[in-house]
Amino acid sequence: MSLINRILSICKTYAYMQPILINNAIDLLKYGATGELLCQNIRNEWLYSNVTSRDENVFQFYNTGQKTCNNDILSLKESFTNAKQFCNNQLPFSFADSRSLCQQENLKCLDVEEKKLFSPRNYTRLKYIAFCIPEENQQYFYHWQRQRKIWWRKFSANPGRFSLTEICTDDNGLESTEIRAEFPWGQETIETIHNVNTKMFDNLDLVEQETFLARVGKRKVLPHLVVSETSLEKAFMVFLCDGYAELPYHNDIREVFRFHRKLAPYKIMFAAPLSNAKKADELKQLSVYLGQSLKKSGVSTLISPNLAKKSLESQFVDSDCLGVPYTAVLNETTLENGILGLRSIETTLEEKIHVANLTSHIELLIKNY
């Protein structure tokens, strides 16, 4: 079985996603419960990096009913006017879109099956548009390339797979570069970054161009644009394929998704060895109680119905395939002294902690990048 088919098999079993095919082309990725959580975390981290933590003001926008999602300038007219008011008409400021549902008009005929999964016909775009001071846009173009590459690498189990292409200049003098990820079947282009300058305004009449004038000090200028774009589907597939690993374990191989803890759909789940009905019920009640405390603290937690009803190893298989960074291992001794084992997906080793400290300890572990 090929690598991508092994990944897709786990995706189906553990409710990540299923590709929907129409006429031998992938129309969309249909997400399951686990996949929805992974998508949500990817989008949240993209927004944090591109909106929340930026030095300049970044405003979100959303194109309704515009399936092709090509030139956004006119659709940004109202948003741009509002942004100028918020910024006292002064550059720089930016826009970000993480919700527009787009459709590829001319779906490329891809020979490699794996590549089709990265480019479904319908996708949710993640687009960032920086409106720069004219004298600073070139420097910002270089800066933004580095920032976007750092973002991909930060959440990767294999940061070395990401690279920037050489900057290309087209016939109109527009510069562009791509971020690519290396996989066993070849390179995937996962994000494009363009130095658009003022080209987006060229097809507008003078009255419409007036709308997009902003100030640098006392000067009125047309902003120079730097644009980057990827999609939620690309990011989903990148981190899915990046995180998948087959690791040696007890003279065997274990399949695992090594997600960054910020992206992992579930941060923690519970496991317990096979026990008699009475002990199994007590362990289940304890896991529910501890799980409620974690959930109230905002920690995505999974309470498994198989706790103490299947072998411990089979429960670990589930947590590894779900990419859960930490598994709280309960046993009969836990009921007596409150000590549990906290298993790491990376090392499979267990750290002993008291149940009273579990929530605060997990909060600390997942807080940092």
What are these model-derived regions, one by one?
Residues 325:
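Conserved acidic residues
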Residues 313-316:
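Short beta-alpha junctions and helix-cap segments that line functional grooves
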Residues 2-309, 332-369:
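TRNA-recognition modules of translation machinery and tRNA-sensing kinases, especially anticodon-binding
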